[in-house]
């Protein structure tokens, strides 16, 4: 266990070091300084020189705000969360929305859904339930190198549906490195060293990629999906339920994990090592070290099952009862969070209750503020008339094949998110796609869903996602290798996303992809 802890610490340090390399003592990097000036400059130039006859002044003003905020999001001139507070200042100044209307978007139901999801995830991490779940899955799947690789991917993918992909990968990487070290230590005379090296590269990448892929399984798995839910409701007044998305998301995750596993094992890092020396023994040893399931783990497990059941049954059960007919996914998330705050812990030396308010220090408040800023900006775009004007301008695309538009959007967002924040990317592009759907005469989810899913999928560069940074920080993979392997995983993801959105999603959600929805 000491080795496990040592490597977890090492990964954390390398992960943090990777991100801190670009941070100099200067208050702004060159790119940030350019963005800091360019954002307000675009705002002023738009107000002064852009005056289409059919766009009211309020629409011009919101377009100017959007350009300013988008520039600061892309360049990270100031922290992304801080940029997301600009609508609170700028929208009332232009008399687009009242302060009350703007502020209410920062307390939207979907924000509380994500808040509750984070609290549940932190409870799992606090009492180490996620480690037990991961090790149990790996132990059950098998001992061959192929099965160990698959076991790590399934375990990481499952965890990242409910906890952050960063936390899932941070847990799994040290276990993977410990297995690799054990294999080197117990290496037999007839074992090919190259095969072990190929296996360790494939294992490290498999963990990182599975952490990213797993987030597509549930609405709380990744921020872009929460943004999709919010923007869809904001623009069209319809809801994507937790249960219905799982019917779309989980098969997508299973297929993507399966194909990525085959690619890593038999194409990218093909090797002849069938069994890993000491691999299965080490997994069992880790499970034994955890001991019997503790009271607190059982409580969190029970609450987790309860939350899942409520989310899954809300659409077809809770809505049928008058008392619970108005319950939303966010209501359930906060209900289970409050239960975690109420239930006492037995190990009071560690914590008095399953969750206490110390959890506030671990919550990603910046992400929640970003959600609110995106929703406030979307409301401003709608209320100012900018959305309708954009729709009119995009009507020239009417007649273009919808599948071609979906392909272009998916590939564009996939590669854009390699160098920009996936959350900021989704926040910027989804309102545009909502308007585009009306212009080209298709259902909005045909364009918005693949963009949100693609925004989550970055496999090529360490800066693409935190999981990529973590696996790069392990020292087992180079940027060149990550980019070459990740490029093909990007293309695999694009193909699967397009097929799911075009052929599976319409059946599950009961929508006609050729039927546009009117903007609110």
Curated annotation (Swiss-Prot):
GO terms for biological process: carboxylic acid transmembrane transport; sodium ion transport. It comes from Staphylococcus aureus (strain USA300). It is found in: Cell membrane. Its main location: membrane. It holds the Pfam family Na_sulph_symp. Belongs to the SLC13A/DASS transporter (TC 2.A.47) family. NADC subfamily. It comes from the Bacteria. The chain crosses the membrane at residues 30-50, 55-75, 77-97, 104-124, 160-180, 207-227, 242-262, 298-318, 323-343, 362-382, 399-419, 428-448, 452-472, 491-511. It is a multi-pass membrane protein. Mediates the transport of the dicarboxylates fumarate, malate, and succinate across the cytoplasmic membrane via a Na(+)-electrochemical gradient. NCBIfam families: dass. GO terms for cellular component: plasma membrane. Keywords: Cell membrane, Ion transport, Membrane, Sodium, Sodium transport, Symport, Transmembrane, Transmembrane helix, Transport. GO terms for molecular function: organic anion transmembrane transporter activity; symporter activity. This is Sodium-dependent dicarboxylate transporter SdcS. The keyword Ion transport applies.
């Amino acid at each position: 266990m000491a080795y496990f802890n040592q490597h977890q610490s090492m990964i954390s340090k390398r992960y943090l070091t990777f991100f801190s390399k670009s941070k100099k003592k200067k208050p702004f990097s060159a790119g940030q300084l350019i963005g800091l000036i360019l954002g307000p400059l675009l705002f002023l130039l738009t107000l002064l020189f852009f005056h289409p006859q059919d766009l009211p002044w309020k629409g011009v003003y919101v377009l100017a705000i959007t350009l300013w905020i988008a520039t600061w999001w892309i360049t990270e001139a100031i922290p992304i969360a801080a940029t997301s507070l600009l609508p609170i200042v700028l929208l009332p100044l232009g008399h687009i929305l009242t302060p009350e209307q703007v502020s209410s978007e920062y307390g939207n139901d979907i924000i509380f859904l994500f808040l509750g999801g984070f609290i549940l995830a932190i409870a799992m991490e606090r009492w180490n339930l996620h480690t037990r779940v991961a090790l149990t899955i790996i132990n059950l799947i098998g001992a061959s190198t192929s099965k160990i690789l698959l076991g790590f991917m399934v375990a990481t993918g499952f965890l990242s549906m409910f906890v952050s992909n960063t936390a899932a990968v941070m847990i799994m990487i040290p276990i993977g490195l410990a297995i690799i070290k054990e294999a080197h230590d117990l290496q037999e005379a007839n074992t090919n060293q190259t095969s072990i090296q190929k296996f360790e590269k494939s294992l490290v990448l498999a963990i990182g990629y599975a952490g990213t892929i797993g987030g597509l399984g549930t609405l709380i798995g990744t921020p872009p999906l929460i943004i999709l839910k919010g923007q869809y409701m904001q623009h069209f007044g319809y809801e994507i339920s937790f249960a219905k998305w799982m019917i779309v998301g989980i098969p997508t995750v299973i297929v993507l994990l399966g194909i990525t596993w085959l690619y890593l094992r038999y194409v990218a890092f093909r090797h002849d090592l069938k069994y890993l020396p000491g691999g299965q023994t080490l997994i069992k040893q880790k499970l034994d070290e955890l001991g019997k399931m503790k009271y607190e783990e059982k409580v969190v497990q029970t609450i987790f099952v309860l939350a899942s059941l409520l989310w899954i049954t809300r659409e077809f059960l809770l809505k049928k009862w008058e008392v619970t007919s108005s319950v939303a996914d966010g209501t359930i998330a906060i209900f289970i969070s409050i239960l975690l705050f109420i239930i006492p812990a037995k190990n009071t030396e560690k914590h008095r209750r399953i969750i206490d308010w110390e959890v506030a220090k671990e919550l990603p408040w910046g992400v929640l503020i970003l959600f609110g800023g995106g929703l406030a900006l979307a409301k401003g775009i709608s209320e100012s008339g900018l959305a309708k004007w954009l729709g009119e301008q995009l009507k020239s695309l009417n007649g273009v094949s919808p599948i071609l538009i979906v392909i272009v959007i998916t590939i564009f967002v996939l590669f854009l998110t390699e160098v920009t924040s996936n959350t900021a990317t989704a926040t910027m592009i989804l309102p545009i796609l909502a308007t585009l759907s009306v212009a080209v005469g298709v259902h909005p989810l045909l364009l918005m869903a693949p963009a949100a899913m693609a925004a989550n999928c970055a496999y090529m560069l360490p800066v693409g996602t935190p999981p990529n940074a973590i696996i790069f920080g392990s020292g087992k993979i180079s940027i060149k290798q990550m980019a070459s392997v990740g490029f093909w995983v990007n293309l695999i993801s694009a193909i699967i996303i397009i097929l799911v959105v075009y052929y599976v999603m319409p059946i599950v959600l009961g929508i006609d992809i050729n039927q546009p929805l009117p903007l609110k």
